[in-house]
Curated annotation (Swiss-Prot):
Pathway: Amino-acid biosynthesis; L-proline biosynthesis; L-glutamate 5-semialdehyde from L-glutamate: step 2/2. Its main location: cytoplasm. It is an enzyme of class 1 (oxidoreductase). Keywords: Amino-acid biosynthesis, Cytoplasm, NADP, Oxidoreductase, Proline biosynthesis. This is Gamma-glutamyl phosphate reductase. HAMAP family: ProA. It is found in: Cytoplasm. Gene3D superfamilies: Aldehyde Dehydrogenase, Chain A, domain 1, Aldehyde Dehydrogenase, Chain A, domain 2. The gene is proA. CDD domains: ALDH_F18-19_ProA-GPR. NCBIfam families: PRK00197.1, proA.
Length: 415
């Protein structure tokens, strides 16, 4: 039996053990993992350095190297996230609803773990910790399949997690890593219906599209973030400047950063040139339509492909429109249903935007950078879903559960 099948089979067995573990036992395991990560920081950073050096040799972009890089502070941040996770309410066993039928049957809908979660992701080694700990908190076994670019970091982190779990009542194989990073191992994971209850891809558009297209197991789609901000003609100038600069430049390599600004032509005629200059001063490359070029000749003419691209860098597309209807049409045509924002003082336009734009998170007068589990108050997330079934938006702990019905009677039979 090859690695993927063997680990899938073992994960299914472990999932049956995890469902019996108490919240206290799961929290003890999380605390052990946090402590072990701190005590073995030097080992993890040493292995991460190997990934970084190999990435530089392969010519990885600065944004990719940033996603790949770990340091002491990022590991501390991971452990702080685990400590916050411990404090969160365990959704498993929660009564979602309860009622009694006229025939005396008592029915309860209870939250239960999904079972075995598969995670396939790119670069970010922190996802290894996030996925492992969130799955453990919700009583799920997890099979991790990272990319070759982070293989040394991922192997080190999972080894550390295993050493932590050995000190607890949770099985070591509650968290398993597929070390084979070839396409064949990924494709095998896509079709492991006998063992996987759900597969969650987390990465770029190409990875996510491949998983959605080829997987036969149920998929929770964490879509790419081609996010927009529409600046309505009534938008406050300073607010618009501050929000756009934050949403683009604070951390351009993440999925909730914006990739396109859509400007109402009346607002753009007054403030567009100043906004473009402010963005360029911060290293942003602008690609715009003909109307944008007429305002600033240094802007590169945007291609059709640019409108649908998640740049994940300091590149920003600029679209000038004559109405909110044109803005909504552009966003719904090219957006990835992740996060979209409107800056406006016109409540009628805000309401129209909220009703008409199809996305997981819609903002009024705020940065799209808040689409995040911790910022929403969830405390933790496994990803940000851009699909509509099961869950949408930041996926907190309840997203990794299903429900079952518990029916209690005293001898009832159906007539």
């Amino acid at each position: 039996m090859n690695e993927v099948l063997a680990k899938g089979k073992r994960a299914k067995e472990v999932a049956r053990e995890l469902v019996l573990k108490s919240t206290h036992q799961k929290n003890e395991a999380l605390a052990a993992i946090a402590n072990q990560l701190i005590s073995e920081t030097a080992y993890i950073l040493e292995e991460n350095k190997r990934d970084i050096e190999e990435g530089k040799a392969k010519g990885f972009s600065d944004s990719l190297l940033d996603r790949l890089m770990l340091n002491e502070q990022r590991i501390v941040d991971m452990t702080e996230g685990i400590k916050q996770l411990i404090e969160l309410r365990d959704p498993v066993g929660e009564c979602v609803s309860a009622w009694e039928r006229p025939n005396g049957l008592s029915i309860q809908e209870m939250r239960v773990p999904l079972g075995v979660v598969g995670m396939i992701y790119e670069a970010r080694p922190n996802v290894t910790v996030d996925a492992a700990t969130i799955c453990l908190k919700t009583g799920n076994a997890v099979i991790l399949r990272g990319s070759s670019s982070a293989i040394h970091s991922n192997k080190a982190i999972v080894a550390v997690i295993h050493r932590a779990l050995k000190q607890t009542s949770l099985p070591e194989e509650s968290v398993q890593l597929i070390e084979d990073t070839t396409r064949d191992s990924a494709k095998q994971l896509f079709t492991m219906n006998d063992y996987l209850d759900v597969l969650i891809p987390r990465g770029g558009k190409q990875l996510i599209d491949t998983v959605v297209r080829e997987a036969s197991v149920p998929v929770l789609e964490t879509g790419a973030g081609n996010c927009h901000i529409f600046i309505d003609e009534t938008a406050d100038k300073q607010m618009a400047f501050d929000i756009i600069i934050n949403a683009k430049t604070q951390r351009p390599s993440v999925c909730n950063a914006i990739e396109t600004i859509v400007l109402h032509e009346n607002w753009a005629q007054q403030y567009g040139s100043e906004l473009f200059s402010s963005l360029k001063e911060r290293g942003v490359e602008l690609r715009g339509d003909q109307k944008a070029l007429a305002m600033d000749s240094s802007i590169v003419l945007a291609s059709e492909e640019d409108w649908g691209t998640e740049f994940l860098s300091l590149t920003l597309a600029v679209k000038i429109v004559s109405s909110i209807e044109e803005a909504i049409h552009h966003i719904n045509t090219y957006g990835s249903m992740h996060s979209e924002a409107i800056i406006s003082e016109n409540e009628e336009n805000v309401s129209k935007f909220f009703v008409s734009v199809d996305a997981a998170a819609l903002y009024h007068n705020a940065s799209t950078r808040f689409t995040d589990g911790s910022e929403f108050g969830f405390g933790a997330e496994i990803g940000i879903s851009t699909q509509k079934l099961h869950v949408r938006g930041p996926m907190g702990l309840p997203a990794l559960t299903s429900t079952k019905y518990i029916i209690r009677g005293n001898g009832q039979i159906r007539k």
